[in-house]
């Protein structure tokens, strides 16, 4: 149970003080300021002082703090604090000290709906929006304003809609054109050796949805037939991320880990049929998140050659080949490190632009459009000054940033997307599915 919730600014001033139970002393805010904010030893999100546990997170110029007694499930409380921050950001557009000060009444009423006697009730924005009588208006210039909902309309909405089985979607939504967008966005972390071998690779992905659909529609989309969620330990040890033909491992299975879903997703259908079925929330939402370490499609084959011909000259030769289909393209940005005592750098490339940036000791190579199944070559001669006290160059890795549209490194893809409305047999909608893979931390050793 949460005994109290507080929002402080960076100085420790109390902006919001909301108690849900009668087991807190008045000194709890002062204890947080003195014992935690001013004490560098307390830099953990969970701190126990006496019989109280302080669970807090920092956002912009705010500290959002929950205080509990006894032995609570702190992970649930931390998740609630993150949901509270997301909800307030959703309502205000931006959450900071000024927006909190201008929306105190709204925040108090919102907390009354979210927590009842210390027990978390809901964090769903649509359900909360229908149950509070004060509506926060997003920023217009530098000012925020509040509008009060009509009380009779609110009472009708609260009694008729909130107790339903779909708290994340209100009834009576109407659009002139029904449309739904599914985006699968992946970030790849990659480490490549100086010989071009993949030392480590992993993918974190999210399935995002933007729904502008009338009524109470049923949506479903199917994922890969060859979809798996875990490997046996003996199998996992025998596999390697270094494979240059990921589809040959495990018969081309897409292997996902740590899958998490929005509450609207019906999990039994996903587990049994690899089908995501749901009644969508209105607007944008993250339907699913996942990670993958196996059977990853590495989009590029990169071989770096860095040779020091003498104390005054280094030769760079980097070849990169796109291993995705020819109809796709990507944008790339290489940050190639050079020693600090560079006198002159002459990069030559067959695509894009490359230039020496002395302030960062790098050569920046930007390729706006790199077609699949093609190869690019980077070549540079770097002249160094002859200094006797120069330290040995540590050879930091090359960093790579990229973005590939209509490509997923995990291999995850949508086979079909269907939208129907039980009360309307002629229901029509526009459906889009998009994919993208972006660089996380991608490094190439030299």
From Swiss-Prot:
UniProt topology in membrane: Peripheral membrane protein
UniProt keywords, alphabetically: Cell membrane, Coated pit, Endocytosis, Membrane, Phosphoprotein, Protein transport, Transport
One of its GO biological process terms is: clathrin-dependent endocytosis
The coiled-coil segments of this chain are none
Q: Which GO terms describe its molecular function?
A: clathrin adaptor activity
Q: Which residues form the MHD domain?
A: 177-445
* Subcellular location field: Cell membrane; Membrane, Coated pit
Q: Which family does it belong to?
A: Belongs to the adaptor complexes medium subunit family.
- Protein name (database record): AP-2 complex subunit mu
Originating species: Schizosaccharomyces pombe (strain 972 / ATCC 24843) (Fission yeast)
Phylogenetic classification of the source organism: Eukaryota, Fungi, Dikarya, Ascomycota, Taphrinomycotina
